Each structure stands twice: as structure tokens, then as C-alpha cells.
A protein has these predicted regions:
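Short catalytic-loop micro-motif centered on adjacent basic/acidic residues
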Residues: 44-49, 73-74, 134-137, 157-160, ...
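Short hydrophobic/aromatic-enriched beta-strand-loop microsegments
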Residues: 69-72, 155-163, 233-239
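Glycine/proline-rich, positively charged
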Residues: 29, 79-185, 190-193
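Structured C-terminal cap/extension of enzyme domains
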Residues: 39, 43-44, 172-186, 190-335
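Conserved residues at the C-terminal ends of beta-strands
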Residues: 19, 49, 103-106, 139, ...
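N-terminal binding-site loop/beta-alpha segment at the start of enzyme catalytic domains
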Residues: 1-70
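Structural motif
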Residues: 37, 41, 95, 152-153, ...
Length: 335
């Protein structure tokens, strides 16, 4: 498996790393089977979060006996010092470990710093001094916050969305991390399911000093990435042309499915409904036109234009308008 150095952490992780958000949706035994198969076939880095319901618990169940052979990162979305320590204690308990390799602030709206009044970064330092965490990281979807974190010198890793749909500013962020020796952990490498050719995604990311974490829920998905261990895809003219075609279709105002607009006070499944037009055209067999799918989309009519989703969107999308456009397009598929 190809490897990458995570900046000044000096941790060496595989270009195939495990994103454990999707294992929330499967049983403990199914998750354990996937996690162990990944480890047995060369995965050494596993990423989760306190917000991912029982993901940490499943990871601890599956990997506790090989703890010293793997790298674990998790996250806290706490906004208070009390919440920080509560999250950390719970994560350590669920993961069945006494330390976390990389502890990350989970998509904060600002860049926590020393002396900012929140006490959050001071708590990180204290946790590190106590040996409960080894490296300090941050995850974000906002370019300005990410850039500030990298330039601050306070963070050893940055986790940020990066795929072959990346803008020039996103690519510049990768270079900024390299200049500051900050490890770049790449999330949303398949753009929330909109990218369906993982070989092209892998080949594109292999050009950069980034560590992709692939969200894996099914064994066939894992097998697909494992096939790249011995035969890693690389960029060629055909893949470059395919990426250019994809960029023309997917660049611009589209929902990435990050879910930071959720929950909706009216019960609208925003992070699915707001990108339904693309899902219908890119995964037509996924049952989007079922009775359940139609009922989900019909909830868009209940939108009261409160603006909460628009204010929360890290990509600055006009979410209410995007929902309405997607619903109008959806109706054309029902005729």
C-alpha cells in the first residue's frame, strides 16, 4: 500500500485509510468484520468522531486488541471546556484505549486558539500533557477557518474535503499545509457519493501528499479499495479527460451532503433532498423514486424559509432555493 507522512506528527499512514462514519448504519459484528479485514489487509489508520453515534464503540470492540499497531483519530464538537472533557472521556472509554493518536476539533465555526476565551485549545494542550492525546488536529468545511488553523501553527493535522472536484483554492490549501508541515487528512474524497469511480478518485489524490479516508459500509466497497493496494491507479489521459467531464457537470452550486444544516425544524432531509437532481442521474437504481423517496421529497413543501440551513451551510448555498429547484426537477421524473 502507498504511504504518506502526516506532516510533523511523523505518523505514516496508508493512502487507503478507514473513515468510520458509515459503520453507524450496520451491526457491531458487521462493523467488526469490516474493520478487521481492513487491518488484516494493510489499513493502519482509522478515523471516527464522538458525533458518529456508536462508531467509536464498534471500533473499540473490533480493534482494542491491536491498539498499538494502529493509528486512531476521533473528534469533539464540544463548544465548552466541560463538554470537551466529557467527550474525551467518553471517546477513550468507547474506543477501549488510554490515548488517542489525533484528537480533532470537529468543524468548529471558528479556529480555537490560545487566549481566545473559549478555553478549548488550552484543554487540548492539557489533554496532551496528560498523555490522553498525542497530536492536535482540526476538521472543517470552511476554507477561511482551515487556512487560519494551518497558519496559526497550533495544529498538526487538518481534515478537509478534497476530491477531483477541488477548486484552485482547495489545491492551494493542500500546498499551504505542505509548507507548514501540517498533515492533510482528506475527507469527502467521493464527494458524499456523487463520485462513483473510486479508481479515478484514488488516482487524482495520489498526486498530492494527502491521506484519504474512505467512508466504508459494505464489504464490496472495502474490496474495491483493497484492490488498489497492489495495483494503485495512476493518472493518465483517459482519467484526466473523465475528470474534466465530471467537473463540467458537478462544479458550482451543489450540495456536498455534509449535513451541517441538519436537523431541519420541519423534518426535511436536507442533505439528501438538496442534491436529489444529481443523485437521480448518478445513482438511478438507488430507489429515490420509491414511495418513501417521494414522501421525503414532499416534505420540501413544508419549508418555512426560516433560513437556519442557509446560515449553517459552510459552502454558502441558498439552501431553501436549492431544495425547491431539486423538488421541481424531481417531479419531472414522476411523470
Amino acid at each position: 500500500m502507498e504511504k504518506v507522512r502526516l506532516g510533523r506528527t511523523e505518523l505514516i499512514v496508508g493512502k487507503n485509510s478507514f473513515g468510520a462514519l458509515p459503520i453507524q448504519r450496520i451491526s457491531k459484528e458487521e462493523a467488526a468484520k469490516l474493520l478487521r479485514k481492513a487491518y488484516d489487509n494493510g489499513f493502519n489508520y482509522f478515523d471516527t468522531a464522538r458525533m458518529y453515534t456508536d462508531s467509536e464503540e464498534k471500533m473499540g470492540y473490533a480493534l482494542a486488541d491491536i491498539r498499538d499497531k494502529i493509528i486512531i483519530s476521533t473528534k469533539t464538537a464540544a463548544t465548552t471546556v466541560e463538554g470537551f472533557w466529557k467527550d474525551l472521556a467518553t471517546s477513550l472509554e468507547m474506543l477501549k484505549t488510554d490515548y488517542i493518536d489525533i484528537y480533532q476539533f470537529h468543524n468548529p465555526s471558528f479556529c480555537p486558539k490560545l487566549g481566545d476565551g473559549s478555553g478549548l485549545y488550552e484543554a487540548m494542550l492539557e489533554a496532551k500533557e496528560q498523555g490522553k492525546i498525542r497530536h492536535i488536529g482540526i476538521t472543517n468545511h470552511r476554507l477561511a477557518v482551515a487556512e487560519e488553523a494551518v497558519k496559526s501553527g497550533l495544529y498538526e493535522t487538518l481534515q478537509f474535503p478534497f476530491s477531483y472536484l477541488a477548486s484552485e483554492k482547495d489545491i492551494a490549501l493542500v500546498k499551504l499545509c505542505e509548507e507548514h508541515d501540517v498533515g492533510f487528512i482528506c475527507m469527502k474524497a467521493l464527494s458524499g457519493g456523487l463520485i462513483t469511480h473510486s479508481d479515478v478518485a484514488y488516482a487524482y489524490l495520489a498526486q498530492f501528499p494527502v491521506a484519504p479516508i474512505w467512508g466504508i459500509q459494505r464489504e464490496n466497497e472495502l474490496d474495491e479499495f483493497l484492490s488498489y493496494n497492489d495495483n494503485p491507479p495512476s493518472m493518465n489521459e483517459e482519467r484526466a479527460a473523465f475528470i474534466e467531464k465530471e467537473r463540467l457537470e458537478l462544479m458550482g452550486e451543489f450540495c456536498r451532503g455534509c449535513g451541517y444544516c441538519m436537523p431541519c425544524p420541519m423534518g426535511i432531509q436536507i442533505n439528501t433532498c438538496a442534491r436529489m437532481s444529481l443523485l437521480l442521474r448518478r445513482s438511478p437504481t438507488a430507489g429515490h423514486l420509491s414511495e418513501k423517496g417521494q414522501a421525503m421529497m414532499a416534505k420540501i413543501d413544508d419549508c418555512i424559509n426560516c433560513g437556519k440551513c442557509k446560515a449553517a451551510c459552510p459552502y454558502g448555498l441558498d439552501t431553501p432555493n436549492l431544495l425547491k429547484r431539486n423538488y421541481e426537477d424531481y417531479k419531472t421524473f414522476l411523470k
